[in-house]
Amino acid sequence: MTLMACVICLGLQAQTSLGVHPKYVVLITIDGLRAEMVDDPLMPSPFLKMMSQEGLRISKVIGVPPAASYPSHTTLVTGEVPARHRVFYNRPFLWNKDTARISYWYADSIAVPTIWQRAHERGLKTASLFWPTSTNSPYIDYNVPEFWSLDYSCDQMEYIKPSCTPLGILDELEQNACGKLDTITYQAGSLQRDGRTAAMANYLMNHYQPRLTTIHLITTDYSQHALGTQSQQLLQDMASADHAVGTIIENLRLTHRLDSTVVIVTGDHGFCDYSQTLSPNVWLTKAGMLSPQPGGEWKACFYAGGNTCFLYLRKGNDRKTLRRVRQMLDSLPNDQRRLFRIVEKEELVEKGADPAVVLALEPIVGVAMTNNRTGEVVEQRRGGTHGFLSGQDATTLIAYGAGISPARQDVIRQTAIAPWILQLLGID
């Protein structure tokens, strides 16, 4: 953890009553949570508004490069940037091979200790539901990971059962907590999903009493990608996510554990609307530096991991190709060049990006990056995106419960959250 992260962590600790170590910590992520989704009076988020008023509220949480689900969720449980924890994107860059739909699913991708590991090694029980990069973690006692088959025609919930811990736990949850899960009752993006996840969490907390529980609520991500940040669908999804959080709070109250629990709600990233897409690999393909399809000859390739395009060279020290790329970027017409800034290696290292990246392109707000290699460089299209380097898509944080006094703080870095959770649990 960096010195700055230590300082910020001390600031978070100051918001907790001195000497208070709650017995339980629950970390909930609402995928794509923005501050406006809590603060806007038109947003149907009464539970989050109540928690924000009565607990600790951090207006802005600045994420890691890129601000995307898998690297960000891994930072939340490690306190480290991608350069250290080694989960760089949602899907790994496979050096001009077809990435298909492979993601950083497995916990052994993480190169540093997690809060699950630290808690488990101290003899504390842990639980997790649908957390990215948690599959096969030996440190999560009760685990239903985010994992899926590349064969979308299969029964996805049956597919993941052998990867759940302990074996049979998902059957137990279906029988006693959430009902049968299938493509209708638990479809990604469905309004039913977050509520059923909350029911599973409540069952695990009631019956097994894990000291640390991590929960990923995903529905709000889908509507924002498809429709942007102002849709009616998002209002419905936000109400669903808020209700899921509310049922967890209610369950803690009814089981007399709210006064011994800290509940932290945050996002992995925020969102920004876009009206144009930009495809930098089209330039490389036209210049003969990249094959039109994955698997061919190449010298350079941009990878849109989130909404920043990271440049990889087939030979990392190929200065000639790097000069060609720079010359290509410098010669672009103004109507294309104005859509992005060049991020140099020094800034990428400082922010903790993949060390193999030689430079990156960060678009202006209103533009979304793609990995397309052919077609138009710029297209008119609308939706929502995230994955900036400069914090335009920051998320927010609320902490509520035992020892948490009403307080406001403007900004923290995402790397400060995991050390604070360990401090709450009394783990040095």
Model-derived features: positions:
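Metal-dependent active-site segment of extracytoplasmic phospho-/sulfohydrolases and closely related
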Residues: 27, 47, 240-283, 397, ...
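Bacterial Sec-dependent N-terminal signal peptides
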Residues: 1-21
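A long, amphipathic alpha-helix that forms part
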Residues: 18-20, 36, 191-215, 220-261, ...
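His/Asp/Glu-rich, glycine-adjacent segments
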Residues: 81-228
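Short, structured active-site-proximal loop/turn typified by the sulfatase FGly-forming signature C/S-X-P-X-R
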Residues: 36-84, 125-128
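Structural recognition of the beta-strand scaffold that forms the well-ordered cores
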Residues: 26-29, 36, 58-62, 75, ...
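Active-site neighborhoods of enzymes that stabilize oxyanions during catalysis
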Residues: 112, 297-424
